[in-house]
Each structure stands twice: as structure tokens, then as C-alpha cells.
UniProtKB/Swiss-Prot annotation:
Organism: Haloferax volcanii (strain ATCC 29605 / DSM 3757 / JCM 8879 / NBRC 14742 / NCIMB 2012 / VKM B-1768 / DS2) (Halobacterium volcanii)
UniProt-listed GO biological process terms: cytoplasmic translation; ribosomal large subunit assembly
Domain of life per record: Archaea
Regions of compositional bias (Acidic residues) in chain numbering: 305-341
Family of this protein: Belongs to the universal ribosomal protein uL10 family.
GO MF annotation terms: large ribosomal subunit rRNA binding; structural constituent of ribosome
Gene transcribed to yield this protein: rpl10
Name by which UniProt lists this protein: Large ribosomal subunit protein uL10
């Protein structure tokens, strides 16, 4: 240890040293560690949130300077979280993945009234309709903050949706009073995830705010496209081998029937085909004495039936191939869902 490090250690009070050590232990105890904003959350509500997270995540509050020192001591990339250490913040640790953590924190947020001097988190709109307030000076207060309001049918009505404040603008005292009177709660109170570090990667909220259903559908679509490519390119994999084998079997059978190749697998079809051709030929011979006894009396009308039977045999082979392909496609769809589900399992 250098002299400067010794001096730095010596000037740090013992309680701070112990606090930093505890913070280091906290950071090293979880697979994912993030920084959450806690500004504006009442103490009682914060304690309630911590209880609700018990078992899935833990929240640790401390002085920002000590948190920064702990992040430096852990290193391993955790120091990247220092850029989010500003204002009223806390560390949050979980052994779950960052996506699940973000989803849980967002779901735990609750609507709350906004106070004068606060910044609007989004556009504030007073909706059209009956305010439920009796005629009086409140109609003027509504108009003063930019709402379209008038007295109608013995009540104060907002005649159209009125955007009274844009995102990022400061809330005036007049607007705060109007919103409180109307019971409009334009902000959400909860742990605001600023960033989370997991497995060497730093995630920000906009990267974690994904549509799970859309993401699942994208994965299923990708699996389906990959399966089709594998089948069409005749590139066997564990997932597509059954489809390729069924396809090859069906095509081989069609070739065998067309080329009259003798094989036990399709001998019945060949015999049926030959019989139909023989009967068609016999029907066109006028001298019945030249025919074997079993073929005498075959009428010319049976010719079409014979040709139809031959055509039916070929169509049956094609149908077998199509049925096999449909069965394999159905199996592929089931496999796609399972593969996509497995791919999402670790994230959601």
C-alpha cells in the first residue's frame, strides 16, 4: 500500500469504513446491481415498497460519496454506475435478470398528485367531461390554467381534452391546486431505475422497456424462418431432420412410381398401376379371342376409369407428400413455440 493510500485510509472515520465495506458486500452479493431514484417517495411508502420487493430484490441506501467509493472498490465494471449517483438514490440488488427487475419496479409504481415546483413527467391533460364541481370561481381557475371550461346544466364542464402542461415544464401552484381539486394524479411514485449492471453489461431503462409479447412473436417468427431456410436448403439439424426425412421419403416414392422401380415399399401401387394400364389396353382390342379369358368383355368405357385410377395413384403419392409436409409443418410450429419459449425463459 502506497503512502497516499495509507493516509487516505487513516483519514476515513471508522464508521464510514464499515459502511463502505457493507456496501461492497451488498454489491458483490447479487448478480444484478442497479441505481434507483427515490426522490419524492414518502418514507412510509418507501418502506412498503422494500417489503414488497423482499425475496426478489433488496434496496440499500447510503451517502452518495460512500456508494461511489464502494463501486470503485468493487471495480469489475460496477464503477459505470457512478454516473447515476446523483440526488436521492439507492442501490438495488437482485439475482434476477435486469428485464425482470425493470418490469417489477414499473408494475409497483402508483399514481400520485403532483406538487407546485415539480417538473411534469409527461404531458398533463384535463379530460373532457363533467368536473363534478358546482358553478363558482373554479371555472375561472380552470380557464386560467388553459382548460376549455364553462358552466353547463348546473355544473362546471370541460368542453374538450385540454393539454395544460407539456412534459418537462414546471408545475405552477395554480395548476397544482386545480389538479388536486379534480383528483388528477399525473405522476407515478415508485423506485425509478436509472441503470443496472449485470454480467458485465450496463443496461439503461430504455433498453429494458420492451414489449414481451412482441419480443416473443419476433423470436417465434425468426425460428420459423430459420426452420424453413434449413428445410429448403436441405441443411439438416436436430429440429429439421424429421421434416427432411419425410420430404425425402415422399419424393423417393414419387420417383419410384414414375420410373416403375420394383421395391417392396410401393409394390402395391405399381401392381395397381400395371393392372389399370392392362385393362385400358384390353378395352381397345377388338378381337376378344386374342385376350385371356379374364380380360374378355372389358368395355371401352372402363378405359377412362383405368386412366383415372392411374392418375389417382399418382395424385395419391402427391397427396401423401403434401400430408407429410403439413404434418411436419404442424410439428415445426409446435417446436417453434417451444424453442421461442426456451429462448425467453431466461429473460422473463
Amino acid at each position: 500500500m502506497s503512502e497516499s493510500e495509507v493516509r487516505q485510509t487513516e483519514v476515513i472515520p471508522q464508521w464510514k469504513r464499515e459502511e463502505v465495506d457493507e456496501l461492497v458486500d451488498f454489491i458483490e452479493s447479487y448478480e444484478s446491481v442497479g441505481v434507483v431514484g427515490v426522490a419524492g417517495i414518502p418514507s412510509r411508502q418507501l418502506q412498503s415498497m422494500r417489503r414488497e420487493l423482499h425475496g426478489s430484490a433488496a434496496v440499500r441506501m447510503s451517502r452518495n460519496t460512500l456508494v461511489n467509493r464502494a463501486l470503485d472498490e468493487v471495480n469489475d465494471g460496477f464503477e459505470e454506475l457512478k454516473e447515476y449517483i446523483a440526488g436521492q438514490v439507492a442501490l438495488i440488488g437482485t439475482n434476477d435478470n435486469p428485464f425482470a427487475l425493470f418490469k417489477e419496479l414499473e408494475a409497483s409504481k402508483t399514481p400520485a398528485p403532483i406538487n407546485a415546483g415539480e417538473v411534469a413527467p409527461n404531458d398533463i391533460v384535463i379530460p373532457e367531461g363533467d368536473t363534478g364541481v358546482d358553478p363558482g370561481p373554479f371555472v375561472g381557475e380552470l380557464q386560467q390554467v388553459g382548460a376549455s371550461a364553462r358552466i353547463m346544466d348546473g355544473s362546471i364542464m370541460v368542453t374538450e381534452d385540454s393539454n395544460v402542461l407539456s412534459e418537462g415544464e414546471e408545475v405552477s401552484e395554480e395548476l397544482a391546486n386545480v389538479l388536486a381539486e379534480l383528483g388528477i394524479e399525473p405522476k407515478e411514485v415508485g423506485l425509478d431505475l436509472r441503470g443496472v449492471f449485470s454480467e458485465g453489461v450496463l443496461f439503461e431503462p430504455d433498453e429494458l422497456a420492451i414489449d414481451v409479447d412482441e419480443y416473443r412473436a419476433d423470436i417465434q417468427s425468426a425460428v420459423s424462418a430459420a426452420t424453413n431456410l434449413s428445410v429448403n436448403a436441405v441443411y439438416p439439424t436436430a429440429q429439421t431432420a424429421p421434416t427432411l426425412i419425410a420430404k425425402a421419403t415422399s419424393e423417393a416414392k414419387a420417383v419410384g412410381l414414375f420410373a416403375n422401380i420394383e421395391s417392396p415399399d410401393f409394390m402395391p401401387e405399381l401392381i395397381s398401376k400395371a393392372d389399370a394400364q392392362l385393362r385400358a389396353l384390353a378395352a381397345n382390342i377388338d378381337d376378344e379371342e386374342a385376350l385371356p379369358e379374364e380380360l374378355r368383355g372389358v368395355s371401352a368405357a372402363d378405359t377412362g376409369a383405368a386412366e383415372e385410377e392411374e392418375s389417382t395413384d399418382e395424385e395419391a403419392a402427391d397427396a401423401d407428400q403434401a400430408d407429410a409436409a403439413e404434418d411436419d409443418d404442424a410439428a415445426d410450429d409446435d417446436g417453434d413455440d417451444e424453442d421461442a419459449g426456451d429462448a425467453l425463459g431466461s429473460l422473463f
